[in-house]
């Protein structure tokens, strides 16, 4: 888990560096005009989206841990390259390549978690590495500020120094990752007997193998496109990512519109990331304390409520109500754990190795689509407060809430339908569990396994 957590934190640090660099005159030094800054974010996530399905296939065919290690080394080099950019074209090219190389990280990590942990353990572990987004952000923001301030007056611009610093960190960690990241079957520090035990404890998951080298099954790919659950995950992810993508990309610029200086802009972002981290920790505690309870969708719905309120405050208040806007800005951070809960659902509720890979890819393609759409709603003509973009974010969060409510009703209905069918066959609970486990070992999907029950 520490390996996944550190890697995920470094990955997100690279993403937020673009926003941090705005405070140190990246737009002015690279002569960005109009919506070009928004396109730097959109281009990254468009490349991320296109690369998802190919990487899903690559990680099923080749050792996943090595694929991820090579991409981390590659993105470290890309972050170095950003420091050498002088115009929009160069920035766009490097950001696009960076998007391709970061594509396998989130879906790959979710599959690695399912390869090591039981279903009741997976959400907590997923939240642990997802929480590094906000935890690392707290320190990276301060580190970026320190590096940027130290570079003032030197021969190199502050934002270039920030990218050199993070590029070095990413590349060095990629080397460490190559020798440490592993699945149970390839773990050098496990004996053959321990590897067998690690596999045996996951039989009750009923989700099949989560390792590389398993045959790609076209029927499981097709099932992804006819499963209502995949559409719930995809649509909810697009809506939330459209809102969070636009808001997070322009967060620094929105804060600057409060007439804050560089130091204040950095400092006032810290409570936002702190709220994200603390709320993820609270969700993790609840999940760990009540592992058998179906609280996932209820928590996601509840956590989106303050985000809806926060975005409305941002959109409706003017700068005469500075603290009202700041509070609105900060409480939008509650959307973060809601997103992580939705993403983790693919590991919990999707069975079959090919279907799981495709579901992960579709989920993060939806995530990327949202992050492509969101920044484009923040028109340069509406700067610096971007009210149309904020109204768009509000509508997306509100619609996502409605969709989660419908999803919750559907999952409960589907589980009850399966229970009634099993009872009609005269099967006891023990018989259902045993047959479900045996079927799960055959790499069949959740829809093919009548004894699979969905978490919600």
Whereabouts are the PLM-identified features?
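Intracellular terminal tails of multi-pass secondary transporters
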Residues: 1-13, 19, 24, 34, ...
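Helix-to-loop junctions at the C-terminal end of transmembrane segments
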Residues: 50-63, 278-295
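Extracytoplasmic gate region of multi-pass secondary transporters
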Residues: 19-20, 216-285, 339, 343, ...
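Extracytoplasmic
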Residues: 2-34, 50, 55, 105, ...
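Glycine-rich segments within core transmembrane alpha-helices of 12-TM secondary carriers
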Residues: 123-158, 163-170, 360-374
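Helix-breaking motifs and short loop linkers at transmembrane-helix boundaries and internal kinks
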Residues: 14, 30-31, 54, 62-63, ...
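Conserved MFS/SLC helix-loop-helix module at the cytosolic interface between two early adjacent transmembrane helices
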Residues: 49-91
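Structural signature of the two symmetry-related core transmembrane helices
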Residues: 66-80, 297-312
